[in-house]
Design a protein with these regions (language model features):
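Bacterial N-terminal signal peptides that target proteins for export
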Residues: 1-8
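Generic N-terminal leader/processing signal
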Residues: 2, 20-21
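Bacterial N-terminal signal peptides
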Residues: 8-16
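Domain-level marker for long, solvent-exposed, non-transmembrane regions
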Residues: 21-166
Length: 166
């Protein structure tokens, strides 16, 4: 009886441990060379927005960092057109703002730059992650939280956007 009880407990522990392991959702190889658009998943009352963003790179880490950068670029310059309509309005309406303030944004989006303060990955155990892997590069779709209100205030303080446009 003790052996059956012990084996049942071990079996349940094994099932619980293996079911919590999450794998990437893998799509076709040829999709790793296709551009994907960001999608707004929702907003929160503290000024944060949740975005499903895509990034490509030679490694998984590079692709995920590029996904964070792409999410921020969409929020700043284009707005996020897919998904929740609350994210459609960009932070700047200035034409060619990226080119006009190129030095500023090159520093902002540099490896380990200030962008890391405004874009964070959600807990990966709770969110889905999509992977498209080709021979040379990988595309990852991850859920990124963008601190939109904080980012807007920083861009106003740095003179990049006009505070009277809001």
């Amino acid at each position: 009886m003790k052996i059956k009880l012990l084996s049942a407990i071990l079996l349940l522990a094994f099932v619980a441990i293996t079911s919590s392991c999450r794998r990437d959702t893998v799509v076709a190889d040829n999709l790793s060379y296709m551009p994907f658009e960001s999608q707004c998943l929702g907003t929160s009352l503290d000024g944060n927005v949740r975005i499903k963003a895509w990034g490509s790179g030679a490694t998984r880490g590079d692709a995920i960092e590029n996904a964070k950068r792409n999410a921020l670029r969409d929020v700043i310059f284009n707005g996020v057109k897919l998904g929740n309509p609350a994210c459609q309005r960009p932070l700047t309406y200035e034409v060619n703002a990226h080119e006009r303030h190129e030095m500023y944004f090159n520093r902002f989006f540099a490896d380990g730059g200030e962008y890391t303060q405004y874009a964070t990955l959600e807990d990966e155990t709770l969110t889905s992650r999509t992977k498209a892997k080709g021979d040379v590069q990988q595309n990852y779709g991850v859920v990124v939280t963008v601190k939109r209100a904080n980012l807007q205030q920083k861009l106003i303080n740095d003179g990049i956007i006009n505070p009277y446009n809001y």
